[in-house]
Each structure stands twice: as structure tokens, then as C-alpha cells.
Amino acid sequence: MEARAVAKYVRVSPRKARQVIDLIRGKEIGEALGILKHTPKKASSIIEKVLNSAIANAENNHDMMVEDLYVSKAYVDEGPTMKRYRARAMGQAGLIRKRTSHITIVVSEKKEG
């Protein structure tokens, strides 16, 4: 049995979010939360909220034991990019890409034995 949580259209670059999500993939819940709490990145607080949501979904919707959970899947997909312009010299304009992410975390119970 597995429970998942998804955060869509998060205003953080997918590349930067993947750096953080790679740290917790395959880890137990307690260890993953500890890693996220001590990672000095903007994406770590967002990913921590998604992980807590996945834990709550597992506990409340699927009657899973929190002590037996681990992060079975964790991935970041690219969302839509907001395009903004910055005025440059001699009448030109520079393009600024504000990237967004879709963050998905799936937690599962460890198999006994």
C-alpha cells in the first residue's frame, strides 16, 4: 500500500528542487524529515510540507503505521514557465524565466521479513 502527496505550480526551479529531493529518496520518514530540516535550501521547506502531507495521507486515509513508512518514490516534474522581460540597453529586452515545479512524494510501508 502506498500514499502520495503532490504540490503543483510551486515557484522553485525543478533543477534546484531535484537537488533536495535526491537526498531523501529511499530514506525512512524520520531520517528524511531530519535531512530536510537541516538542508539550507529554499526547496527543502516546500518538500518538507509535501512529505508531511504524504505521511498524513498514509495515516488517515490508508491506516498505515507511521513508524513503518519510507519514501518509496520522490520526483520533481517541470511546471509551466512564467516569462518576464527586463529592459536592457539600447532598447532591447532580456527574457527572465520564472520556473515552476510539480513535486510528488510517495510513501510506502516496509515489507516485513
From Swiss-Prot:
Annotated GO CC locations: cytosolic large ribosomal subunit
One Pfam family from the record: Ribosomal_L22
GO biological process: translation
PROSITE patterns listed in its UniProt record: RIBOSOMAL_L22 (PS00464)
InterPro entries tied to this protein: Ribosomal_uL22, Ribosomal_uL22_bac/chlpt-type, Ribosomal_uL22_bac/org-type, Ribosomal_uL22_CS, Ribosomal_uL22_sf
Gene Ontology molecular-function annotations: rRNA binding; structural constituent of ribosome
Transmembrane regions: none
Keywords: Ribonucleoprotein, Ribosomal protein, RNA-binding, rRNA-binding
Biological role: This protein binds specifically to 23S rRNA; its binding is stimulated by other ribosomal proteins, e.g. L4, L17, and L20. It is important during the early stages of 50S assembly. It makes multiple contacts with different domains of the 23S rRNA in the assembled 50S subunit and ribosome. The globular domain of the protein is located near the polypeptide exit tunnel on the outside of the subunit, while an extended beta-hairpin is found that lines the wall of the exit tunnel in the center of the 70S ribosome.
Family: Belongs to the universal ribosomal protein uL22 family.
NCBIfam families, per the entry: rplV_bact
Binding partners and assembly: Part of the 50S ribosomal subunit.
The protein's name: Large ribosomal subunit protein uL22
Source organism phylogeny: Bacteria, Bacillati, Bacillota, Clostridia, Halanaerobiales
